[in-house]
């Protein structure tokens, strides 16, 4: 699928596979509770384990966040300057209207600003944060190689963005 087809699928409530800076991700619109539930079932992941999120930029991040105390705002600005965009995920208080599948019991979500150009563009075209969990069934290995994506997982999605630049491989994002 091309970028616009994948973005349209996400906007329509779909689940897709797309590249990130490290691995292929299984994702959907982070604001769509039904899509998040479908993704959890497809991945075989317990609903008690919230999904990590990616955003395109600080504006995308701020749209997710609950009001922050001033000291946390300052720390976040320093962190962002030093580590983002990049594979560092941070637990931050997010808006209560987000689905429970992307927030823990304390209202925190794992979020990062992705440096991958296709993932960044996908966030922009969707207009918000994306779920970014590894594109594998829970307990199975994740991959940076499009040829190694699980055919059954692919079949359970609306499609995949398999275009360059490919994921670089290596460790998933650090929390």
Spans of features found by a protein language model:
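Active-site-adjacent structural elements in enzyme catalytic cores
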Residues: 1-175
């Amino acid at each position: 699928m091309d970028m616009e087809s994948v973005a349209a699928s996400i906007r329509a409530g779909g689940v897709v596979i797309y590249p990130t800076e490290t691995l292929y991700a299984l994702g959907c619109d982070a604001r769509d509770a039904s899509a998040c539930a479908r993704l959890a079932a497809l991945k075989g992941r317990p609903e008690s384990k919230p999904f990590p999120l990616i955003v395109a930029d600080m504006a995308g991040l701020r749209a997710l966040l609950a009001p922050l105390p001033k000291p946390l705002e300052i720390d976040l600005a320093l962190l962002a300057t030093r580590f983002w965009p990049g594979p560092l995920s941070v637990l931050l208080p997010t808006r209560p209207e987000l689905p429970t599948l992307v927030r823990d019991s304390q209202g925190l979500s794992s979020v990062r600003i992705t440096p991958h150009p296709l993932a960044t563009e996908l966030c922009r075209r969707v207009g918000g944060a994306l779920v970014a969990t590894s594109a594998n069934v829970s307990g199975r290995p994740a991959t940076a190689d499009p040829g190694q994506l699980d055919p059954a997982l692919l079949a359970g999605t609306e499609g995949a963005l398999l275009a360059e630049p490919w994921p670089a491989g290596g460790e998933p994002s650090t929390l």
